[in-house]
From Swiss-Prot:
Gene from which this protein is expressed: eno2
Family: Belongs to the enolase family.
Active site (UniProt): 207 (proton donor), 339 (proton acceptor)
Coiled-coil annotated spans: none
Pathway annotation: Carbohydrate degradation; glycolysis; pyruvate from D-glyceraldehyde 3-phosphate: step 4/5
HAMAP family reported for this sequence: Enolase (MF_00318)
The protein's name: Enolase 2
High-level lineage: Bacteria, Pseudomonadati, Pseudomonadota, Gammaproteobacteria, Pseudomonadales
Cell location: Cytoplasm; Secreted; Cell surface
Cofactor: binding details: Binds a second Mg(2+) ion via substrate during catalysis.
Pfam families listed in its UniProt record: Enolase_C, Enolase_N
GO molecular function, one term: phosphopyruvate hydratase activity
EC number: 4.2.1.11
Binding positions (Mg(2+)): 244, 287, 314
Cofactor(s) for this UniProt protein: Mg(2+)
Length: 427
């Protein structure tokens, strides 16, 4: 079978926020084709791979991606045409070398990732394998706990509600992914009713979660617990809670500005707040509890809570092996958030996950707030056996598509599928 790359074509499409992004088609000599589209974040880490934007204010307020598209259709195509799509690492490393920068700013992380993912899809198609099996082999059968972001704050809610960006539920007590998805959907709808009864807006944010104008951050947890119970489930043993404060968004001059509560706190005071919540509520995961460059604060956080809950670094690590290695060496967390577009290739994404595993850390795959209907992260999650992922609320087509892909994968695996459940998290 001829799995050499014959053609690559990129185009500018829209993401779930109506902003331009890159979509790439890769066609092989055997006729197999792979298509991938690239997401975009709102609360981006300062150390992420660069998303190349045109900055032409006459188009899409400067957010066009025609330069990235052109880079795929010219320079990248010319370099990888004729290469074997099965040689994923070789192709990815060639694109990294071709770009020549540490942050993929010349060709664009969005251009490179689009090609990287489309190549993998084309190769899987040529071999007549589902993507998760192509990437993970026969042993890939661990279904993840879905982390449903059902209540939004921070930048995702235009700073109209809680300071903390995401309040999630994790149905660890379910027996399968299919059951976990049902539990999550039921709690989501109960939360809508709870909010409506309390006189709050039930409009949804970028990731499908509700974005009520709450007075206190803890109100979000109280409302979610009420919704879990009203749906007929037990907080803790059946459904746990995860929080992503996205603390870099309210960190300034060494202090954390809790706008909704009208106070500024230092790292230790914020850690004390988290500790009191872990004592009081069934919290299993805390992501980006402190700012991306507050390394000394993270050490204190890990010392306080690292043996009780999973502490995930997102902006702290940006899926970058150099930053993850520093985190392991300095003992600042116990898990890594994995976003392929933070680093820019499938090969580097897998390396980040493997580095986390090597340190007995957790790895949680994630979507971005500006998404597409590309479901590659679902296949990647099962392929790498990460056991948990977050991809928004069970609402909005671009979020639900990932969850539906997991249903297909679980069905495809049949009796071989097993649900990560309570073992999903490091604790």
């Amino acid at each position: 079978m001829k799995t050499q790359i014959q053609a690559i074509h990129a185009r500018e499409i829209l993401d779930s926020r109506g902003n331009p992004t890159v979509e790439v088609d890769v066609t092989l000599e055997c006729g197999a084709m792979g298509r991938a589209s690239v997401p975009s974040g709102a609360s981006t880490g300062a150390h992420e791979a660069v998303e190349l934007r045109d900055k032409d204010t006459q188009r899409y307020s400067g957010k066009g991606v025609l330069k990235a598209v052109s880079n795929v259709n010219t320079e990248i195509l010319e370099s990888v045409r004729g290469m074997n799509a099965i040689d994923q690492e070789q192709i990815d490393h060639l694109m990294i070398k071709l770009d020549g920068t540490s942050d993929k700013s010349r060709l664009g992380g969005n251009a490179i990732l689009g090609v990287s993912l489309a190549v993998a899809r084309a190769a899987a198609s040529a071999l007549n394998l589902p993507l998760f099996q192509y990437l993970g082999g026969e042993q890939a059968a661990r279904m993840p706990v879905p982390m449903f972001n059902i209540l939004n704050g921070g930048v995702h809610a235009n700073w109209q509600g809680p300071d903390f960006q995401e309040f999630m539920i994790a149905p660890t007590g379910a027996g399968s992914f299919k059951e976990a998805l049902r539990w999550g959907s039921e709690v989501y709808h109960e939360l809508k009713a709870v909010l409506k009864d309390a006189g709050y807006s039930t409009a949804v944010g970028d990731e499908g979660g509700f974005a009520p104008a709450l007075k206190k951050n803890s109100d979000a947890i109280e409302l979610i617990i009420k919704a879990i119970e009203r749906a007929g489930y037990t907080p803790g043993s059946q459904i746990e809670i995860a929080i992503d404060p996205a603390s870099s968004g309210f960190y300034e001059n060494g202090l954390y500005h809790l706008r909704s509560e009208g106070r500024k706190v230092d790292a230790q005071e914020l850690i004390n707040l988290y500790s009191s919540w872990v004592d009081k509520y069934p919290i299993a995961v805390l992501e980006d509890g402190l700012a991306e460059d507050d390394w000394s604060g993270w050490k204190l956080l890990n010392a306080a809570l690292g043996d009780r809950i999973e502490l995930v670094g997102d902006d702290l690590f940006v899926t970058n092996v150099e930053r993850i290695q520093r985190g392991i060496t300095e003992n600042v967390a116990n898990a890594v958030l994995i976003k392929p577009n933070q680093i820019g290739t499938l090969t580097e994404t897998k390396a980040a996950i493997e580095m986390a595993y090597g340190a007995n850390w957790g790895a949680m795959v994630s979507h971005r707030s500006g998404e597409t209907v590309d479901s590659s992260i679902a296949d990647l999650t099962v392929a790498m056996g990460t056991g948990h992922l977050k991809t928004g609320a069970p609402c909005r087509g671009e979020r639900v598509e990932k969850y539906n892909q997991f249903l297909r994968i679980e069905e495809d695996l049949g009796s071989r599928a097993f649900y990560a459940g309570h073992d999903a998290f490091v604790r």
